[in-house]
Amino acid sequence: MKKLGTDLLKRGFAKMVKHGVVMDVTNVEQAQIAEDAGAAAVMALERVPADIRVQGGVARMSDPEMILEIKDAVSIPVMAKARIGHFVEAQLLESIGVDMVDESEVLTPADEVNHIDKRAFTAPFVCGARNLGEALRRIDEGAAMIRTKGEAGTGNVVEAVKHMRAVNEGIARVVGYKEMGLEAELIQMARNELKVPMELISEVAELKRLPVVNFAAGGIATPADAALMMQMGCDGVFVGSGIFKSGNPATRAKAIVEATYNFDKPAVIGEVSKNLGEAMVGINIDEIPEEKLLAKRGI
């Protein structure tokens, strides 16, 4: 019962930022711009994904002092990234009071086989997923929020779209099997394909969605990108490099918040999309060498 209560509390926090925008920030000034723009939360990190991609090297957890400075400067929740499998980085982030830990493929993985046992923490976690199997495996480990992986730092939404479609298609299969009474197929799917407990599959079949909130991330650069992902069924969006690598960060941040909230109102999205200045320079996915793709990290 204690574990269930903890899961409910963690998922409850994640629901608090539903329909909102989480913005990557690297300093206090950016965090304040994000808060003023209406961000639901900020992600504190030393380098945005676009810079990590260009500069290379090993990307690690950010300096705790920088994270604390941002926490002191804003009243909205502050998240921070830990490397995949690096449970000590997660322990440090929990100890300084971050509101949510992102076990992130943007950073260099510390463990190529295992993810963090998120049930061992009181802090909630968000994790990336490319398909239903990855999403449910992270939830089984204790994740309170899922996001598409997309391809961070590219300003190109195509991979986020691909990942959201894959999750939606997986859910549709589960629901279809359940409605047709194909219990044997569901059991086989859980055991051999998705590699998760049947209880999670049953929960997906009943809810007809993931049992936790599911945000878009990776390549969101414009208000239209944000609205696209929301119309595909996302519960909110993460924006990494797309704001502070653009020509007018404050205006673009506000516009993306408005578009996320009014995702089904094209006239509003069109209005807020005017005069935003230059968007970040994007990268075509097929121009990225296979070994440089971030979304492959963690399975």
UniProtKB/Swiss-Prot annotation:
One of the Pfam families matching this protein, by short name: SOR_SNZ
Residue numbers binding D-ribose 5-phosphate: 24, 153, 219, 240-241
Keyword list, A-Z: Lyase, Pyridoxal phosphate, Schiff base
GO molecular function: pyridoxal 5'-phosphate synthase (glutamine hydrolysing) activity
Broad EC category: lyase
Listed EC numbers: 4.3.3.6
Active site positions: 81
Any single biological process term in GO: pyridoxal phosphate biosynthetic process
InterPro entries: Aldolase_TIM, PdxS/SNZ, PdxS/SNZ_N, RibuloseP-bd_barrel
Gene3D superfamilies: Aldolase class I
Binding site for D-glyceraldehyde 3-phosphate: 165
Catalytic reaction(s) noted: aldehydo-D-ribose 5-phosphate + D-glyceraldehyde 3-phosphate + L-glutamine = pyridoxal 5'-phosphate + L-glutamate + phosphate + 3 H2O + H(+)
Pathway: Cofactor biosynthesis; pyridoxal 5'-phosphate biosynthesis
Subunit structure: In the presence of PdxT, forms a dodecamer of heterodimers.
NCBIfam families noted in UniProt: PRK04180.1 (NF003215), pyridoxal 5'-phosphate synthase lyase subunit PdxS (TIGR00343)
The family this protein is said to belong to: Belongs to the PdxS/SNZ family.
Record function comment: Catalyzes the formation of pyridoxal 5'-phosphate from ribose 5-phosphate (RBP), glyceraldehyde 3-phosphate (G3P) and ammonia. The ammonia is provided by the PdxT subunit. Can also use ribulose 5-phosphate and dihydroxyacetone phosphate as substrates, resulting from enzyme-catalyzed isomerization of RBP and G3P, respectively.
The name this protein goes by in its record: Pyridoxal 5'-phosphate synthase subunit PdxS
